[in-house]
Amino acid sequence: SQKEIYEYMFGLLDNAVKILSDPNSQGLPSNHDVLFAGDKTKWVKFANSLKFRLMAHSYNAFKAAGKDLAPEMQKIASGSYMSATTDNASLAFSGLNEGESWYLQTKWGTGNDYSEQKPTKYLIDQMVAIDDPRMYVIFKPVLTPISSKPVKTNEDIKINGFTYRVTYDPVSGINPNDLNVAGRDLNGNIINVPYILDSKWFGTPTPLTVQLIYAGSNLTGGNSFYDNRRLTGFSALIAKPTDARLRAVMMESSEMMFLLAEARKNGWISTGTVKDYYEQGIKLSFSRWQIVDGTKPASHIGSDQIIDNYNAYCAKDGVALDGTAADLDKIALQKWLSFLITNQTEAFTDFNRTGKPAFIGKIAASFSSYSYPYRYTYPLDESSNNKENYTSAVTALGGKDLPSAKMWIQK
């Protein structure tokens, strides 16, 4: 059963911590350890943090089954866990070829993943509203905005050390029908979305159908609103094959802090404060993107490096906690932002577990002809090579191996 699998994983991690904590244990040779260069203390922190993540995933399911995981969670919260960016469990890319490079790089292949994937309007609006410094690191401004300027105008804009050529297209040359599009609001309702002239930051409106494909980046025509270059895209940093900020992430310290904040808010642990864990999670997320804590400039336009005041950001409306139940929504939102382009699987799992950020579920539900996916289906060879266990597992899921089947931790 899935309960037994979770218990087995808990046991594996406990045993790993026991072995690594033994002073007579030599651990891995530093030149054989690609994660922590033979540092046993970091492996212990990673194991404890992984266990804490798994316990957060399954807390409610175990509680319903008669087992309270709170004492085990408290033991970790009072002990050793990932708490600094140097504790992050992630791998660097060599950048020597396509297979050993960051997944959105443009040096090899078509570069379509980089050019055609776009942030949603909700995400960009949210980041603009709180002037989130991560936006200036991960994304670039609209390269060909529809403009109120009377003639086509070029402007070079430097952000975070990268220079972008922005070409303003006069609105006089645009079909008026292309200045509005039907989209969906955060409740899934169909609304009219106007294009904001001269926008530097304009995310992709949520479409009416999941099949809608946005135009390519070569401005070949069609609905100008939906042209790729009319919308915010990934920054030049994200196109690189390798960089200290572009890593294969297993788990980061910022996630652990948000897990601790959630656990403290829910009463699963009694150590620390929700506020301290939450704000430390934000600061660690900023730090991993090399956002400098300092005096924030009036604008990040023209910057060689993004600088922001960490404490001032945490005090902003929409970010600061207020001690109410809404704090769980803010924790989930900041955790979701910290997962941007680095840990999509955990972001997906977290939403399935908590239902937060809530707007995702509302928009997904508005596509009523589709069943929301909760899980990956089993590999095809399981049904033939492991038929007995496969059949038993599918039976526990309700008889069908479907993405929409809820797992034990979600029931």
Can you say where each PLM-predicted feature lies in the sequence?
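Structured, solvent-exposed acidic/aromatic patches
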Residues: 1-284, 288, 324-326
